[in-house]
Amino acid sequence: MGNLVDNKFTWVIQNFSSSQSRVVPSNQFVIGGCKWRLLVYPEGFNKSGDHLSLFLEVADPRSLPPGWSRHARYLLTIVNQHSDKISKRNEATKWFNQKIPGWGLSAMIPLTKLHAKDGGFLVNDELKIVAEVNVLEVIGKLDVPEESEEETQVTQPMKKVKVDYDHVESNDLMINETPPVSELMDVNGFQVLPSQVDFVKRIFEKHPDIAKDFRPKNPHLRKACMNFLLSLMETLCQPPQKLSNEDLVEADNALTYVKVSGFKVDWLEKKLEEVKKKKEEEQTGEARIQELEEELKEFKQKCLDREAMLEKEKAKVLTARAPLTLDDVI
């Protein structure tokens, strides 16, 4: 069953355990004028057999015109029907494009936890998934005019399908509505949103040669490249503890993309290496903290054990020191 309300798509997969398919796609749904679909890999995207994989994908990306790109924030949830507190969630803000039309997690939930008896994720052999999508920006035309979007509901039992989704990447993504042209502003030949103007101006003031060798002339491609640059810088401003290793791999890819486009970003490459080092130090420090906490826990337990032994010995000494009474002697 699929139900779309207020940018939230709810998908209930029936007869989940009987699936023989490598990938199970949801029906298409429209949010922000863009067509989407969910992809579930019951035994994992890489056929690992130990985790379920879940992705959000732009529906039928091959039908879209060259240069299309969509920026969106999404939240994917595998619902625990006994307690929402232990539902599994994946939230991210990403760019969807021809190269990467889908984002999500290859290790969304361990299969042992998913199939656990009375675990709450599979109830009556039904798996409930909720996708919330907020489209931030669209480069290229919308799939569907937003006024034509309607609430849809479809019953979808598990069935075997043959679909080639090998191009789906194991990450996450986001999207946005296309602003009217009048809302875009020009900064050094790049069309940006009003909210981005001051930041982009600061970039050009501090790095005036950044676009000296920039090659693309198409305004949509120029805008896409600038958005990749801004997204990369936004990532680098995140606290290390909030960045995953996948985020850093994605940042590396974004850096390569903007460099190939002609942006001079040597300074940004150094910052990325600095963030990587901070992340490594954070992970190493976190591991050391856990190790020390375990050692301290063991030490405290030993202290408690020693204190208990000490009290026992004191009790024995007191007993030994007690004099015999007259009754004991007689």
UniProtKB/Swiss-Prot annotation:
Gene3D superfamilies xref list: Apoptosis, Tumor Necrosis Factor Receptor Associated Protein 2, Chain A
Cited SUPFAM superfamilies: TRAF domain-like
InterPro entries referenced in this protein's UniProt entry, alphabetically: MATH-CC_domain_protein, MATH/TRAF_dom, TRAF-like
Domain of life: Eukaryota
A Pfam family: MATH_2
Keyword Lyase: no
Membrane-crossing segments per the record: none
Coiled coil: 263-314
Stretches assigned to the MATH domain: 6-133
Keyword annotations from UniProtKB, A to Z: Coiled coil
Keyword Chaperone: no
The name this protein goes by in its record: MATH domain and coiled-coil domain-containing protein At3g58210
Species name: Arabidopsis thaliana (Mouse-ear cress)
